[in-house]
Structure formats: structure tokens, C-alpha cells
């Protein structure tokens, strides 16, 4: 009698309860984010070299690292970057000078004065690049944008001075690096920068 009348509903209920429990646990405890997420914009590094750098950093720093080189500004790279920055997933941005200047103007990078001053690495002083940031002044007109109208600050570092970067064969030696606005992993980002400028 049980098999004929109750087996299918009980089995279906058990499957539904298991599925709901699995989904609830999955949403409550998402995957741990990496200790360092570096966004490499517009082919400043090839995919194979990004993978090699990621593996080397994980060994050297002893933390989980993602070097994401899928930020093509001619396609959907800016949208992806904005989405990930708004959810505070990106720690470091590496981009060609022209794109980096644009990103600093949007307000996507932090002032590196504290990073440089906390580091014992003297190479960082010479590598610092001053760029105009974002201005959110109240006196801006309704139709004006604050992009690139902020004060010039140390938003980037020249990677041409970084031995860890220039030793990579296919890297863009004119690229800049900076720490993303809102990162929760500033310490790891600083360790990564110090490692590049070793």
C-alpha cells in the first residue's frame, strides 16, 4: 500500500527538501574570494603569462590569487570592471597608460601615497605617476562630469621600473599598476606591488 500511494510523493518531497537545503547553504556561505584579484586591462599581459604569474604569486605570497586578463575595453571590459569594482572584488588594476589615466579619472583607483610611504622599497618613489582623479565637487553643473577634473595624486606606478613585471616576456612595459578603490585586501595588494618591484 505504501509503494502505491506514498512512495513517489515522499521521494519527491525528500528531493525537494535536499535541493532547497543545498541552495540555502550555497547562498548563505558563498565561495571564499581570493586574497588578491588583479584586473589586467587591454592585453597588458597575455593569457598564458597571466596564468604563469598567478601560479608564481600563489607560491611566493602563499595566498589564493586571480590574475584576470579578460578586460577588453573595446568590448565589455569597462562594464565588467565597473561591476566588479562596485562589489569590491578587484584589488589591483594593471592597464596601459592611456586606459589607466581614464580609470583614474573615473575615480576607480586609490591614492598610493600611503602605500609608497609604508613600503621600504625605494623603487616605488621613482615609479610613482601623478594623474588627475575624479571630482565630486558640489559646484559642478548638472550636465558636467567630474571625470578627470580632480586633483593630481599618486594613483599609479610605472611597471617599467618593476623587475618582476619586465622579466615577463610578453608584458606591456609601459603599463601602470594601482590599487582599486574600495579594496578590502590592501595589505595583499601592497605585498604584490612590493614583489613586482623587488
What are these regions (language model features)?
Residues 24-31, 165-169:
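Short boundary motifs at domain starts and secondary-structure transition points
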Residues 31-97:
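Early extracytoplasmic/lumenal segment of secretory-pathway proteins
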Amino acid at each position: 500500500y505504501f509503494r502505491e500511494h506514498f512512495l513517489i510523493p515522499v521521494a519527491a518531497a525528500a528531493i525537494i527538501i535536499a535541493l532547497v537545503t543545498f541552495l540555502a547553504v550555497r547562498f548563505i556561505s558563498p565561495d571564499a574570494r581570493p586574497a588578491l584579484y588583479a584586473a589586467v586591462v587591454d592585453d597588458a599581459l597575455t593569457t598564458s603569462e597571466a596564468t604563469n604569474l598567478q601560479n608564481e604569486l600563489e607560491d611566493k605570497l602563499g595566498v589564493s590569487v586571480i590574475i584576470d586578463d579578460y578586460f577588453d575595453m573595446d568590448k565589455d571590459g569597462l562594464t565588467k570592471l565597473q561591476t566588479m569594482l562596485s562589489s569590491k572584488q578587484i584589488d589591483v588594476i594593471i592597464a596601459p597608460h592611456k586606459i589607466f589615466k581614464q580609470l583614474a579619472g573615473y575615480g576607480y583607483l586609490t591614492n598610493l601615497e600611503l602605500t609608497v610611504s609604508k613600503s621600504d622599497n625605494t623603487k616605488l618613489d621613482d615609479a610613482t605617476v601623478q594623474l588627475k582623479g575624479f571630482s565630486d565637487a558640489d559646484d559642478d553643473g548638472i550636465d558636467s562630469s567630474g571625470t578627470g577634473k580632480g586633483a593630481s595624486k599618486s594613483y599609479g606606478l610605472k611597471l617599467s621600473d618593476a623587475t618582476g613585471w619586465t622579466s615577463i616576456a610578453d608584458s606591456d612595459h609601459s603599463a601602470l599598476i594601482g590599487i582599486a578603490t574600495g579594496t578590502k585586501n590592501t595589505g595583499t595588494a601592497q605585498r604584490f606591488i612590493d614583489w613586482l618591484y623587488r
